[in-house]
UniProtKB/Swiss-Prot annotation:
GO MF, any single term: proton-transporting ATP synthase activity, rotational mechanism
UniProt source species: Spinacia oleracea (Spinach)
GO CC terms in record: mitochondrial inner membrane; proton-transporting ATP synthase complex
Recorded name of the encoding gene: ATPC
Protein name: ATP synthase subunit gamma, mitochondrial
Keywords assigned by UniProt, alphabetized: ATP synthesis, CF(1), Hydrogen ion transport, Ion transport, Membrane, Mitochondrion, Mitochondrion inner membrane, Transport
Subunit-structure text: F-type ATPases have 2 components, CF(1) - the catalytic core - and CF(0) - the membrane proton channel. CF(1) has five subunits: alpha(3), beta(3), gamma(1), delta(1), epsilon(1). CF(0) has three main subunits: a, b and c.
Function field: Mitochondrial membrane ATP synthase (F(1)F(0) ATP synthase or Complex V) produces ATP from ADP in the presence of a proton gradient across the membrane which is generated by electron transport complexes of the respiratory chain. F-type ATPases consist of two structural domains, F(1) - containing the extramembraneous catalytic core, and F(0) - containing the membrane proton channel, linked together by a central stalk and a peripheral stalk. During catalysis, ATP synthesis in the catalytic domain of F(1) is coupled via a rotary mechanism of the central stalk subunits to proton translocation.
Location of the protein in the cell: Mitochondrion; Mitochondrion inner membrane
Record bears the keyword Membrane: yes
Domain of life: Eukaryota
Length: 26
């Protein structure tokens, strides 16, 4: 269960980083 939570957190962090990069580009 713990590993799934970590994986989900990593995915969410990557998504947030993509959004922040897109915002910076604009």
């Amino acid at each position: 269960i713990g590993t799934q939570i970590v994986x989900n957190x990593m995915k969410s962090i990557k998504n947030i980083q993509k959004i922040t990069k897109a915002m910076k580009m604009v």
